[in-house]
Swiss-Prot record:
Protein name according to UniProt: Cytotoxin homolog 5
UniProt record similarity statement: Belongs to the three-finger toxin family. Short-chain subfamily. Orphan group XV sub-subfamily.
Localization annotation: Secreted; Target cell membrane
The organism of origin for this protein: Naja atra
Upper classification of the organism: Eukaryota, Metazoa, Chordata, Craniata, Vertebrata
Cysteines joined through disulfide linkages: C24-C43, C36-C61, C65-C76, C77-C82
Length: 83
């Protein structure tokens, strides 16, 4: 029984990412993503303000949420693949 418990603990440690890293989409395609570098704790998505369809023009990792501009609206989030 102790062996089974120890095995489960070892498998859990191996399977979990001990140093949490955020994964963000980094292209317009929603199924492609990258692991963010250390210190980049937010995902962002930029869309054109004046365009009727809210198609993302830029996605990626950020340390701070970028500020909206005259053309782009930024939305930020902090969970995996949330952008």
């Amino acid at each position: 029984m102790k062996t089974l418990l120890l095995t489960m603990v070892v498998v859990t440690i191996v399977c979990l990412d001990l140093g949490y890293t955020l994964k963000c989409h980094n292209t317009q395609l929603p199924f492609i993503y990258k692991t963010c570098p250390e210190g980049k704790n937010l995902c962002f998505k930029a869309t054109l303000k004046k365009f009727p369809l809210k198609f993302p023009v830029k996605r990626g990792c950020a340390d701070n949420c970028p500020k909206n501009s005259a053309l782009l609206k930024y939305v930020c989030c902090s969970s995996d693949k949330c952008n």
